[in-house]
Swiss-Prot record:
Xref: InterPro entries: DNA/RNA_non-sp_Endonuclease_sf, Endo_G_ENPP1-like_dom, ENPP1-3/EXOG-like_nuc-like, Exog_C, His-Me_finger_sf, Non-specific_endonuclease
Subcellular location: Mitochondrion inner membrane
Assembly and interaction partners: Homodimer.
Organism: Mus musculus (Mouse)
Lineage: Eukaryota, Metazoa, Chordata, Craniata, Vertebrata
GO cellular component: mitochondrial inner membrane; mitochondrion; protein-containing complex
List of catalytic residues: H140
Cofactor(s) for this UniProt protein: a divalent metal cation
Protein name: Nuclease EXOG, mitochondrial
PANTHER family: ENDONUCLEASE RELATED (PTHR13966), NUCLEASE EXOG, MITOCHONDRIAL (PTHR13966:SF19)
Gene3D superfamilies given in the database record: 6.10.250.1250, Extracellular Endonuclease, subunit A
Described function: Endo/exonuclease with nicking activity towards supercoiled DNA, a preference for single-stranded DNA and 5'-3' exonuclease activity.
Annotated residues for binding of a divalent metal cation: N171
Record-level Gene Ontology MF annotations: 5'-3' exonuclease activity; endonuclease activity; metal ion binding; nucleic acid binding
Length: 368
């Protein structure tokens, strides 16, 4: 079925007027991140608190029918929270907390589907149809792989409120490697907080003028960011007196090779806040001794051989036939990477399973 146009969805949406309030309820009532909470009072409550004791008649008339609502209130989920940009149909920021326990478990992304966030009014939501055939991938800000502990938490990362149009190679390559590094940090830090989001940065023309322009995709004009950012805050343990480790990174939304180091994309938190218009970790005492995460830790991403081997090992599970499985091994060797013992053990186990299945299917076919 063809996707409805934006105008028709705006007219037909029964949730158009109620959606603003629905989003506010989600932001106020959801359960989840407890260590660092980013709450904003609903606009109506904020306006009420801001009034002077003796409100003038002019002020009362001014807000008689309410102020415009932007839908930027915090929306909370099982293991992430976000602020949504209703005009661009992408998140402004997405906050998550990960630990060693959260990145292991039985949750499997093959059971998850990309879909609109039910808390976002349909008039302001992106659709899968906006992405399909656009030349851009659906890029997670809070990745599914950070939520192996909970099927619900993982499924919620597939809401389109957590997704931005992302370069395919960037999504599966460099950005993926940054996400893997964040998970690796949980081996050395008990708590890791991550804020990720899109940026649309200005570029300078030949005549010296600065402009901001960006592509939009689909009927809903989903904004394609020029860059992506990630802020990482790591704590050794709740009892530790060691300084917190912090790093802010901005990467272009394009393919990035293996030669580029993560530290090359590091920026100061202050500069990122100026770029984004956001204040990150506002409850963090910046007067304390906060260390550069690239000085405390390695900031080293997986190299070509390690990363290729990792991806090939994952493809073993997805193989549905002996022929497909054999192609995984052929592709790995063609890339110049030799399989390690772990890969070979997984490969042999999967090969036995597929051969047994194919023999069973052949017998059933003969009997029928």
């Amino acid at each position: 079925m063809a996707a409805k146009s934006f105008a028709s969805r705006l007219r037909d949406s029964r949730r158009f007027l109620n959606g603003f309030l629905a989003g506010a309820v989600v932001g106020a009532a959801g359960a989840g991140l407890t260590a660092l909470q980013f709450f904003r009072r609903p606009d109506a409550e904020s306006a009420k608190l801001a009034r002077q004791p003796h409100e003038s008649a002019e002020e009362a008339v001014l807000e008689q029918f309410g102020f415009p609502l932007a839908g930027t209130e915090t929306r909370r989920y099982t293991n992430h929270a976000l602020s949504y940009d209703q005009a661009k149909r992408v998140p402004r920021w997405v906050l998550e907390h990960i630990s060693k326990d959260k990145i292991i478990g039985d949750a499997d992304r093959k059971h998850c589907k990309f879909k609109p966030d039910p808390s976002v009014p349909s008039a302001f939501s992106a659709l899968n149809e906006d992405y399909i055939g656009s030349g851009w991938s659906r890029g997670h800000m809070a990745p599914a792989g950070n939520n192996k502990f909970s099927s619900e938490a993982m499924a919620e990362t597939f809401y389109l409120s957590n997704i931005v149009p992302q370069n395919f190679d960037n999504n599966s390559g460099y950005w993926n490697r940054i996400e893997m590094y964040c998970r690796e940090l949980t081996e050395r830090f008990e708590d890791v907080w991550i804020v990720s989001g899109p940026l649309t940065l200005p570029h300078t023309r030949n005549d010296g003028t600065k402009t901001v322009s960006y592509q939009v995709i689909g009927e809903d004009n989903v904004a394609v960011p020029s860059h992506l950012y990630k802020v990482i805050l790591a704590r050794r343990s709740p009892e530790s007196t060691e300084p917190l480790a912090l790093g802010a990174f901005v990467v272009p939304n394009k393919a990035i090779g293996f030669q580029s180091q993560l530290s090359e994309f590091q920026v100061s938190l202050h500069d990122l806040e100026k770029m984004s218009g956001l204040v990150f970790f506002p409850r963090l005492d910046r007067s304390r001794d906060i260390r550069n995460i690239c000085s405390v830790d390695t900031c080293k991403l997986l190299g070509f051989q390690e990363f290729t081997l990792y991806l090939s090992t994952r493809k073993i599970d997805g193989a549905r036939s002996v022929a497909r499985l054999e192609k995984v091994l052929e592709a790995l060797k063609s890339s110049g990477v030799e399989p390690d013992d772990y890969f070979l053990s997984r490969y042999e186990k999967k090969l036995e399973e597929l051969k047994a299945k194919e023999q069973k299917d052949a017998q059933l076919e003969k009997q029928s």
